[in-house]
Regions:
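Non-catalytic alpha-helical scaffolds and adjoining flexible linkers that form interface surfaces
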Residues: 1-203
């Protein structure tokens, strides 16, 4: 079987059938950022995978029930869907994603900086860490943002979550990260979940 994070569309064996809705306890497994053990086969039309057998590797109750965590999960899930183009078998990336999801699930303190922390680790795993001297290369980060990035990488996860940042700072940081990723991937990145994320952290 294969164990992985839900990033792209997948349907139970047989696909959608009129009059045969998926049972609630089955569909609940397939929320954004669910981590499952599964046996998959390629669909006839390619792209869409069919799940023959699947079960949750972890139960993630707080991500499902807490609005802040579920919004962060939705943002990360959409980001991965639009930017993660690596072939299967990247164990290092998988371990990073699994660890990040479990940290989000188990966090009991402040998490307003979680998506910033995640973006640092994610871009690093993709091969273009947002640190160092870029010289004449495209750099969307301001000097103040670079100070925050460096500090966040030098402290623990718990300390990074407590790092003081204004709402506007977080929003600007995300925008800078998306421009940075667009430059390195060569693709435009438009996330529908970004507006919801900003609204959640408005207060």
């Amino acid at each position: 079987g294969r164990v992985g994070t839900i990033l792209r569309g997948a349907v139970p064996n047989g696909g959608k059938r009129r009059g045969s809705p998926i049972k609630g306890n089955s569909i609940s497994i397939l929320h954004p950022l669910s981590i499952i053990s599964a046996q998959c086969t390629s669909g006839r039309k390619g792209g869409l995978e069919i799940l023959k057998e699947y079960s949750p590797k972890y139960i993630l109750p707080s991500i499902r029930s807490e609005i802040t965590k579920s919004t962060i999960a939705l943002f990360i899930s959409e980001l991965l869907y639009r930017t993660l183009l690596l072939p299967e078998g990247d164990e290092s990336m998988y371990q990073f994603l699994e660890n990040a999801i479990l940290l989000l699930e188990r966090s009991e303190g402040p998490i307003a900086n979680f998506h910033i922390w995640f973006l640092i680790g994610y871009t690093t795993k993709l091969g273009f860490a947002p640190l160092g001297d870029f010289g004449s290369e495209f750099d969307p980060f301001s000097a103040k943002q670079r100070e925050v990035l460096k500090k966040m990488t030098d402290i623990s996860f718990i300390e990074a979550m407590k790092l003081p940042m204004e709402r506007e700072q977080r929003g600007e940081m995300i925008e800078s990260f998306l421009k940075y990723m667009e430059f390195h991937t060569g693709n435009r990145i438009r996330l529908n979940s970004l507006a919801v994320l900003k609204e959640i952290f408005k207060n």
